[in-house]
Regions:
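Charged helix-capping and loop-helix junction motifs
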Residues: 118-128, 166-169
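Bacterial Sec-dependent N-terminal signal peptides
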Residues: 1-23
Length: 227
């Protein structure tokens, strides 16, 4: 009997160990590029009441200042290629230190690439939103949807099976926005095809947008009176 008990303990302990390994969360973010961008931001002039676009490479690649050259408030790009919700959370105090007029937040796809559970991403988003509210109460907060990808174009293994997770993440982001009383902006209809993939019309690599796609993005923000 004791042998069976010991075997059961060994078996359940092993299964528990496997589960714990599978549930391990990758919260890293401060790679060399992240650190370089942060060092660059620290050296820029202080600008009060700006509109800030905050996110990963999809945000960073846009020429927001030129796209909004006629806008009545300063516009700042605070995108960092490869960033994720942990990285944005870590730098949000710096982002809102100068009391921005508005923050347009987009993240999510890099969380999916590293297979973070949606619950972890949403928790980070919630903490980001609440920090903005606490540090800069007058700042308007806009949560923008994660964009789909096109796995028929992408060549990286880490993108496989990720696109099917985007709709559920966006559903949770929309719910979060309601709970936190901030605005959710669904960008997916602008850029996805009939199959829910990032349209070939707007991407070359299956993940990032071509430059002209940002013109359409800004037009939506203006049409909706967010800008």
């Amino acid at each position: 009997m004791n042998r069976y008990i010991l075997f059961f303990i060994f078996l359940t302990g092993s299964v528990g160990g496997i589960t714990a390994q599978q549930a391990k969360i990758d919260s890293s973010y401060a790679n060399w590029y992240y650190q370089q961008r942060m060092a660059y931001f620290e050296k820029l002039p202080t600008i009060q009441r700006a509109v800030i676009f905050l996110g990963n490479s999809i945000t960073e690649r846009a020429e927001w200042q030129e796209l909004l050259a006629d806008y009545r408030y300063p516009v700042l790009n605070r995108g960092i290629g490869g960033d994720n919700s942990f990285g944005i959370l870590a730098r949000i105090d710096d982002v809102v230190r100068n009391k921005p007029r508005a923050v347009f937040l987009m993240d999510g796809i890099n969380d999916q690439f590293r297979k973070l559970p949606h619950e972890v991403s949403i928790q980070n988003y919630r903490r980001i939103v609440r920090k903005i509210k606490m540090k800069s109460p007058r700042t308007k907060i806009y949560i923008q949807s994660a964009l789909p990808i096109n796995e028929m174009i992408t060549t990286e293994d880490y993108t496989r099976g990720r696109n099917e997770l985007v709709p559920e993440l966006n559903k949770k982001l929309s719910q979060l926005a309601k709970e936190e009383d901030v605005v959710f902006i669904d960008l997916c209809p602008l850029f996805q095809d009939d199959e829910g993939r990032l349209s070939k019309e707007y991407t070359v690599d299956g993940v990032h947008l071509i430059p002209t796609a940002y013109i359409k993005w800004v037009k939506l923000l203006k049409d909706k009176k967010y800008l």
